[in-house]
């Protein structure tokens, strides 16, 4: 029996002549749609399918039946580099949960969450929502469209666009059709797109705008596997061969029988690849991280449980999707975990990181939220700017409330019975701040993908917002360690996800060693890169992360830096840069970015950038200092309000204050080889467009070393002479 019936889909408007078997069903006001969807442009026709409706054509199976995937992988290796390869799942003896596929996960979710709102999106300034039934049916339609376009097993559909329902439909549809989901960052150059699309053998590329379409048109001749491009947010500028809109894709898919799609779904196995995540490629070409269906479904279930994500039966989680879905952290959190637990995922505008994110947060009021450290830092800086512009009494009230709350959270972090002053501070001040940020209902705030400064963590603790860390890699399907309201320790990355394992190798006297991981989260291998796969996975199957850290007596992990980032001075001293960089930023609130230098050099030096405002249109750093930076200048006796005033004129007061701050950091250093002896302030803050930051705002150290080579070399010229 086919698992689907026809469900209307329309990106821009509904065709009134389109036949729809549900036209006789009067369910427009049921949960999951807005009552006026039929009058507004919509992704679907506006009616929610109920479980009892004969039109949905779904024969829901019991969980036991859905999980009964035949799997005989006893002879498989733990790794493969072939897109069509299989691996032996890491079931025994620590993680015996039955494996299942993405389709089985979604199909089970329909039984529990079918009528709940799944995806929220804005059309003509109004929020619209679709249910999990509609989500599933549209994904099937997209899957059939991909099959009609010629998607082959173990080939990819590459997606190049901002977060949207269509991104989700394309991803889920790809897996249903037996393909491999491959995200490409929207900031990627045509050359980077060409490398990834060629490496993953993309049969179809899905883009959102004409700008992204133009990139693909430039490189199409160099992509032998590419058969078609689908564009969804705006139509192509003209009719082009093998370029389709999303509506045309779905129309083509109607020619594929439901039974043909079901046959493909039924042959899928949990130990086959379904997602490719490409690393940033800071030391060469990007590596394609192959993730199996079991990697995805196991992590979506158990990784999120470790973060206290709730199933919709208890409380439907509401999340805002805005971080790049090409990154595993956003993809596993927004897309796959959402399906597992029946969350409602609402999409922010494409310019969310340029300043509109807070508007979406206020409108949606998420129950859990994830941001990379740079996002949390920008929120902190914005609050500080607003506070600086407030009246004397309001500013003092905020400082008092944050001081009282920070002290309470530091001294009695797990005490639910807070003293009267803390409750008063929260009621009078902090609750209003959280509401203004859109966090009034947010119970869990996560961060990952990069280290977070102690200053930022303490700032949000002062607002009664705990930031819960997760630690993992693309190669561990995202979270291998998680913090939660019940598993929290300040500055730590949480504890290992139950069912996973960790060990530290080559530990020093302080217990710091390389972090090695084992479990169902561990990737299949790097696509077409056997040597790199052997470097990452040892003979016993442990993933060597390249990250350094230590474990406390309770199993909480503390990251100390990257093995590859470890600075080895000319004198043979091993210096982890991150703690020193964080100490400088903590000591000097005017500093935005700090990067330590000294590998194979006789002493340490540092590049600094100043906190500046961002252009609201482009999100580029401007020359204007933030309010916090201006306050710092005033405190030290400077009238500067721009970066150029400080750097161009070598502002004596600011330079002296920075010198004194660095001397204080040096005074607290373990030994003289850890002292910063020279430093320079750059004329512009680090940014994605400048190349110093990656798509998730992670510092690209090799790029910085190359870009500012002349400045760095000048630090050491006297030494050479």
Swiss-Prot record:
Residues 1-64 are annotated as: Disordered. The modification Phosphotyrosine is found at residue 655. Residues 26-43 have a biased composition (Polar residues). It catalyses: a long-chain fatty acid + ATP + CoA = a long-chain fatty acyl-CoA + AMP + diphosphate; (E)-hexadec-2-enoate + ATP + CoA = (2E)-hexadecenoyl-CoA + AMP + diphosphate; hexadecanoate + ATP + CoA = hexadecanoyl-CoA + AMP + diphosphate. ATP binds at residues 279-287, 469-474, 547, 562, 698. GO terms for biological process: long-chain fatty acid biosynthetic process; long-chain fatty acid metabolic process; ovarian follicle atresia; response to glucocorticoid; very long-chain fatty acid metabolic process. Gene3D superfamilies: N-terminal domain of ligase-like. It comes from the Eukaryota. It is found in: Cytoplasm; Cytoplasmic vesicle; Microsome; Endoplasmic reticulum. GO terms for molecular function: ATP binding; long-chain fatty acid-CoA ligase activity; very long-chain fatty acid-CoA ligase activity. Catalyzes the conversion of fatty acids such as long-chain and very long-chain fatty acids to their active form acyl-CoAs for both synthesis of cellular lipids, and degradation via beta-oxidation. Can activate diverse saturated, monosaturated and polyunsaturated fatty acids. Belongs to the ATP-dependent AMP-binding enzyme family. Bubblegum subfamily. This is Long-chain-fatty-acid--CoA ligase ACSBG1. It comes from Rattus norvegicus. The lineage of its organism: Eukaryota, Metazoa, Chordata, Craniata, Vertebrata.
């Amino acid at each position: 029996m086919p698992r689907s019936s026809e469900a209307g889909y329309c990106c821009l408007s509904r065709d009134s002549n389109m036949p729809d078997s549900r036209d006789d069903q009067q369910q427009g006001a049921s949960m999951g749609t807005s009552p006026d969807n039929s009058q507004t442009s919509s992704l679907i026709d506006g009616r929610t399918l109920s479980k009892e409706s004969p039109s949905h054509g779904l024969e829901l199976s019991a969980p036991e039946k859905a999980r009964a995937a035949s799997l005989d992988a006893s002879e498989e290796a733990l790794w493969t580099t072939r897109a069509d390869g299989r691996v032996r799942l890491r079931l025994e003896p620590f993680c015996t949960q039955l494996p299942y596929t993405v389709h089985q996960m979604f199909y089970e979710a329909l039984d529990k969450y079918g009528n709940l709102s799944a995806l929220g999106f804005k059309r003509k300034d109004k929020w619209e929502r679709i249910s999990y039934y509609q989500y599933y049916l549209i994904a099937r339609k997209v899957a059939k469209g991909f099959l009609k376009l010629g998607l082959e097993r173990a080939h990819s559909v590459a997606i190049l666009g901002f977060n949207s329902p269509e991104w989700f439909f394309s991803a889920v549809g790809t897996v249903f059709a037996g393909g491999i989901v491959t995200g490409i960052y929207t900031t990627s150059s045509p050359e980077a797109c060409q490398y990834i699309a060629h490496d993953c053998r993309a049969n179809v590329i899905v883009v959102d705008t004409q700008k992204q379409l133009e990139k693909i048109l430039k490189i199409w001749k160099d992509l032998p596997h590419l058969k078609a491009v689908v564009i969804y947010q705006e139509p192509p500028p003209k009719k082009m061969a093998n370029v389709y809109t999303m509506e045309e894709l779905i129309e083509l898919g109607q020619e594929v029988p439901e039974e043909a799609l079901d046959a493909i779904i039924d042959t899928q196995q949990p130990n086959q690849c379904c997602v490719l995540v490409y690393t940033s490629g800071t030391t060469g070409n990007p590596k394609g991280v192959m993730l199996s269906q079991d990697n995805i479904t196991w992590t979506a279930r158990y990784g999120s449980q470790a973060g206290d994500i709730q199933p919709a039966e208890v409380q439907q989680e509401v999340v805002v999707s805005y971080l790049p879905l090409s990154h595993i952290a956003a993809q596993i959190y927004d897309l796959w975990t959402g399906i597992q637990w029946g969350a409602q995922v609402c999409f922010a505008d494409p310019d969310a990181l340029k300043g509109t994110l807070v508007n979406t947060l206020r409108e949606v009021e998420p129950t859990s939220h994830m941001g990379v450290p740079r996002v949390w830092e920008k929120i902190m800086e914005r609050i500080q700017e607003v506070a600086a512009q407030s009246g004397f009494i309001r500013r003092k009230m905020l400082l008092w409330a944050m001081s009282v709350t920070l002290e309470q959270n530091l001294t009695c972090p797990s005490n639910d019975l807070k003293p009267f002053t803390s409750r008063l501070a929260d009621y009078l001040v902090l609750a209003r701040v959280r509401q203004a940020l859109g966090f009034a209902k947010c119970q869990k705030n996560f961060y990952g993908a990069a280290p977070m400064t102690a200053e930022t963590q303490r700032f949000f603790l002062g607002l009664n917002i705990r930031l819960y860390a997760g630690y993992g890699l693309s190669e561990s399907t995202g979270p291998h360690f998680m913090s939660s309201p019940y598993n929290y320790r300040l500055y730590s990355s949480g504890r290992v996800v139950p069912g996973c394992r960790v060990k530290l190798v080559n530990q020093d006297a302080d217990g710091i060693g390389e972090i090695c991981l084992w479990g169902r989260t561990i990737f299949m291998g790097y696509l077409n890169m056997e040597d790199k796969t052997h470097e990452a996975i040892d003979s016993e199957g442990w993933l060597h992360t390249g990250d350094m850290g230590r474990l406390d007596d309770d199993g909480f992990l503390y990251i100390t830096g990257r093995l590859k980032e470890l600075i080895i001075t000319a004198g043979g001293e091993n210096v982890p840069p991150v703690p020193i960089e964080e100490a400088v930023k903590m000591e000097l609130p005017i500093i935005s970015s700090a990067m330590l230098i000294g590998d194979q050099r006789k002493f340490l030096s540092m590049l600094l950038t100043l906190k500046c405002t961002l252009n609201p249109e482009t999100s580029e750093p401007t020359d204007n200092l933030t309010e916090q930076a201006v306050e710092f200048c005033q405190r030290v006796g400077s009238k500067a309000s721009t970066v150029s005033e400080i750097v161009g004129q070598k502002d004596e007061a600011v330079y002296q204050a920075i010198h004194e701050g660095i001397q204080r950091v040096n005074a607290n250093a373990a030994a003289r080889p850890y002292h910063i002896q020279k430093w320079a302030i750059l004329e512009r803050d680090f940014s994605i467009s400048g190349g110093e930051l990656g798509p998730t705002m992670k510092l690209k150290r090799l790029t910085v070393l190359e870009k500012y080579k002349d400045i760095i070399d000048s630090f050491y010229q006297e030494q050479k002479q």
